[in-house]
């Protein structure tokens, strides 16, 4: 099969926004105008096509980023047909992992803002992620029909809050209830969409007289922003010559691709106005796969490799999402960076070093599927039934293996114990958790060796709520949830010498006798965690009993004498003891060793260690005092701050036990405008008062 759409006419874009900016409605309208969907879905009645998981429809928030393919030739059919792959990204802070993942596979993004609420906190987090992956973007100010809508205020906020160089491409005609349409500042014409056919058709009209001056002023700003693309345009602009429409658009495109400006459109998706012109802007200003740098990767011999967006290069694709579909099982969403693959072909998973067969390939339209025979560079599609592919794996040609950059997934920050309500739920729960962990790399499952409980960990309280909710709905598993937990450790601070342990029983018949003398000493934290040194001379303890001494001590390490937590960073030197020809046995020496260890541990200045997290908070400057004050109350050690005019980054080390509920507290302190990340850093000694409280609580159990 030949390529149907040249790769230069592809646009892989994400639609990304704060919760409630109307992103899903905007995506819906894109599907409607591009002719994919014949009935408009409204989020208000839970019927949007992009939000396809039950909970999303109930909660009215987007959780799974669905990828959809649509075609567009422009409002006035002025372009050749372009293929737009839309990736809908979630806007909630607990799902930033999904946003980050979709940022990897996008070439450009449309940032949707609410004309009333403006640039919201989550928009700042998403913006930082888009900066990290250098994604060119345009903005769409939605909800112009709402009370309190103010387009130019949002254009300003993109500058002041996000540091984005925003330029208005349009001005709204009227606002709130009187929102009629927009003025195209390049053509200097008013666009009036036809309400009778839900905005499918429109007319160009003259700009209302009372807006002419404002439009001319804004157009001058737009043209100047375009002229800065090159010296010759600057000369033309300053000598008073008019730039042609073509020159303006080419120059704006050049600056958007270089991430130097953010063109801003406006409209009301709900009222069917503005999305059509925004789609034109996607084609005019956002990059095709061939406009962005070749994706980098690592070759088999550890050298750096790359893949250009071309059908002629070896096949390379990145799996960016795994979803479970009720009818076909596993769907692996992937983005093809280079080459061509047909259904039935075998590909190589270079991360897991396994071969996979591409059985069926489908292109998704929200929650409907169309089966296709091949995919080419630039395509986004889903494969059905791949066996062992995880998020972030590379699928490539076996004769040209490459690992495209691994995605970095943040460490989970909160853990809770889950237990099935009935015996029947027990088996189903294991299966359900395994499936959910495969879909979502920021969610982990493990069994606590000390308590035997199943522990689930994730990115926040909402994240784990939704996991438990999905277990109930999709896998019909009912479970009880425990309280968030912290894993402590025990160790010693001083060396004790010549501690004796003796196990002797003479009760008629064969007795038991084991006798050891040990030294116990602390080890460096970064070391092996435990060492056993045998210094027995002259056979005072026969060689066959030495391993039993080591084993007896290791069994004690699993549950420390202080509060039953694992013991780390201790060394034992066995240097004396005695035995009995008849009564000594491995068991007797094991018991003697454990008695000696317990006795020595109590004298070696035992302490409790707690996990310390490396915490980074990014907050607007206005809230720095509150954030630092709150961190200090959480026993934080603040290591420093980096600031620019939009955001202050605070680095701190905080005990994990003090971080529960932090996301909620931080949101309320900063009106939701700050974000934070944390990862495990080290174990450190817990202050006496804290340690005593923990030890008392454990004893009470």
Curated annotation (Swiss-Prot):
GO terms for cellular component: cytoplasm. GTP binds at residues 17-24, 88-92, 142-145. Its main location: cytoplasm. CDD domains: EF-G (cd01886), EFG_III (cd16262), EFG_mtEFG1_IV (cd01434), EFG_mtEFG_C (cd03713), EFG_mtEFG_II (cd04088). It is found in: Cytoplasm. Gene3D superfamilies: 3.30.230.10, 3.30.70.240, Elongation Factor G (Translational Gtpase), domain 3 (3.30.70.870), P-loop containing nucleotide triphosphate hydrolases (3.40.50.300), Translation factors (2.40.30.10). InterPro entries: EFG_II, EFG_III, EFG_III/V, EFG_IV, EFG_V, EFG_V-like, EFTu-like_2, G_TR_CS. Pfam families: EFG_C, EFG_III, EFG_IV, GTP_EFTU, GTP_EFTU_D2. Residues 8-290 form the tr-type G domain. Belongs to the TRAFAC class translation factor GTPase superfamily. Classic translation factor GTPase family. EF-G/EF-2 subfamily. This is Elongation factor G. It comes from Actinobacillus pleuropneumoniae serotype 5b (strain L20). The lineage of its organism: Bacteria, Pseudomonadati, Pseudomonadota, Gammaproteobacteria, Pasteurellales.
